[in-house]
């Protein structure tokens, strides 16, 4: 049990560091179910250029937080660990059987171009994979060039 906790902690620390920047978007997450209260939004509301690159669902904006919590709980039952993110995005990691980690991100959004947004306006959740092994070691910073022969290091 302690070994699993240590491994999970290490995964979270590595993934958080790896995801400090906006992660690259892979393709739509294909294993995310349509939970109660969500409706499929194949075009992702034609917002954020997500159509075709993410699996999107919609619900009234006033309910999107509760729906996001339900998706987080559902993903946790399938071994996805919340590892980072920001105000409107959660990054998840999942250990691969052969080593390394898969990444998934959930982003909440709505149409910010509207002047008067209400709780009944559509809110969206987009799910997309993060390409590559997100637990892979980050490249080390380049070493300082060696001092030229005959010079005194400073």
Which residues fall in each region the model found?
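An acidic-aromatic pocket/loop used at catalytic or ligand-binding sites
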Residues: 4, 20-154
């Amino acid at each position: 049990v302690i070994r699993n906790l240590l491994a999970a902690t290490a995964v979270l620390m590595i993934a958080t560091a790896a995801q400090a920047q906006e992660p690259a978007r892979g393709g739509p997450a294909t294993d995310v179910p349509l939970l109660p209260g969500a409706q499929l939004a194949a075009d992702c509301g034609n917002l954020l250029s997500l159509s075709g690159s993410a699996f999107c669902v919609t619900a009234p904006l006033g309910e999107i937080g509760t729906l996001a919590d339900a998706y987080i709980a559902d993903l946790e039952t399938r071994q996805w660990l919340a590892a980072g993110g920001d105000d409107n995005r959660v990054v998840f990691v999942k250990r691969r059987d052969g080593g390394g980690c898969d990444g998934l991100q959930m982003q909440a959004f709505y149409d910010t171009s509207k002047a008067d947004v209400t709780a009944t306006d559509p809110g969206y959740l987009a799910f997309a994979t993060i390409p590559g092994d997100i637990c892979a070691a980050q490249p080390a910073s380049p070493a300082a060039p060696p001092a030229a022969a005959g010079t005194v290091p400073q």
